[in-house]
């Protein structure tokens, strides 16, 4: 079956690496279930995705379906530094996106790939408005935990007290969740947060939350059962994670902006089981130079082997390039590797990896849990502080190295060493590993055929197919043709008494196909005479309602 014959969903992503990865993973899951998926984002990161992952213009087969890519220009210069300022960039992305996405949808329809559903991720809620304007359904992929979805929901609607200028240290009790201390609440909700633009960007989706017919989440029922069941009474959520595990798309295209250093796997192969600490703080967290120095000295003192990912900052970010202490690599020798970007999924699944020192972003959290990997929690801001609370206190797979930006301190080398040793040896490490393997088994059961997430995703796919069939039946309900002129039934431009003139008749036809061109309207209405099929086919070029009406009448 060719890709053009499949039900088509159109995914629109914000440009952040932490947004692209889960939405692309969802796209591959949907394709594996037999859909045609188009993944779309701005060209400024599209060019990096093409370069790092070998993306081409051809649809790529994934399971029973296909995935393809389209990128659009945001109309800013390639090196425009304002992309780093969300208060400036998000309005620009919305302005351009609301114009170009409908054009892309129309072009796909003209090329035989009509779109049946749009799906977006946070920061670009206007995609739901675009879908609504086109008469298409929309869905949204939430890229944080169900607990954070609930926290933002209750904050936005003022349902429970949160830290405020009058009560900075207010703990937060949300139904079906453990008590969150003030510094365990998503930090963008702090009244003193230095990132108010991120609060605005995230909460923007909540103003549009009634428009998507489904909110998909990269989590699974068994992991967050109580809060998922509670939130399901407030909004149409479906847990479909972990998305990064896809048995039908093991070698499918990735969305990394930098090419991963796969040679590191060969080095890992030479190390003993559970002996290597993996350190990565994601795609947007940049530490102070002083903190990097303390982590480096703590690593050397602990004696553990390690892989440390040190991603260089974006040239326009304003961050300085971090450097390692003098002589660090020489002292570490063959027991340490420092890389710019890594194949994280492969490292976390490798038997030589002992634990993951992580910023606790949700993508990394899901990858560690699904890989059965204990963690050392090093959250900085946003949902990371909430995820760290769950990893350590609820899922019991981690030790906490810091509490995030509210703590506002550099973690000294002796504490770094203590946490590394606690996570890699002794009874605490064994207990964490046992719990991590339990969550790995639960995650694998969830995404396996017939598991909770697989059932939820299949239900979503079935609903998209049902909607697609309904859309197709409406578009084909314009009528049937009796009259033929040179094998083509045509509407004429002339009007009689303010109505479109009747169709001329002829006795010939071509290929047994009747074609209906766009009729002209009079008095704000389009009136269509009775049409009958020829050899069971009627092809309609385009019918546009005038004043919101298309009327069918029998002749």
UniProtKB/Swiss-Prot annotation:
It is an enzyme of class 2 (transferase). Highest expression detected in fruit, with lower levels detected in flower and petiole. Barely detectable in leaf and root. The keyword Glycosyltransferase applies. Keywords: Detoxification, Glycosyltransferase, Transferase. The keyword Glycosyltransferase applies. Optimum pH is 8-8.5. UDP-alpha-D-glucose binds at residues 344, 359, 362-364, 367, 383-384. Its EC number is 2.4.1.177. Optimum temperature is 21 degrees Celsius. Induction: By oxidative stress and hydroxycinnamic acids. Down-regulated by synthetic auxin naphthaleneacetic acid (NAA). The active site is at residue 19. It catalyses: (E)-cinnamate + UDP-alpha-D-glucose = 1-O-(trans-cinnamoyl)-beta-D-glucose + UDP. GO terms for molecular function: cinnamate beta-D-glucosyltransferase activity; quercetin 3-O-glucosyltransferase activity; quercetin 7-O-glucosyltransferase activity. It comes from the Eukaryota. An anthocyanidin binds at residues 19, 382. It holds the Pfam family UDPGT. One of its GO terms (biological process) is response to toxic substance. Belongs to the UDP-glycosyltransferase family. Broad spectrum multifunctional glucosyltransferase. Catalyzes the formation of cinnamic acid and p-coumaric acid glucose esters during fruit ripening. Accepted substrates range from derivatives of cinnamic acid and benzoic acid to heterocyclic and aliphatic compounds, resulting in the formation of O- and S-glucose esters and O-glucosides. May also be involved in detoxification of xenobiotics. This is Cinnamate beta-D-glucosyltransferase. It comes from Fragaria ananassa (Strawberry). The lineage of its organism: Eukaryota, Viridiplantae, Streptophyta, Embryophyta, Tracheophyta.
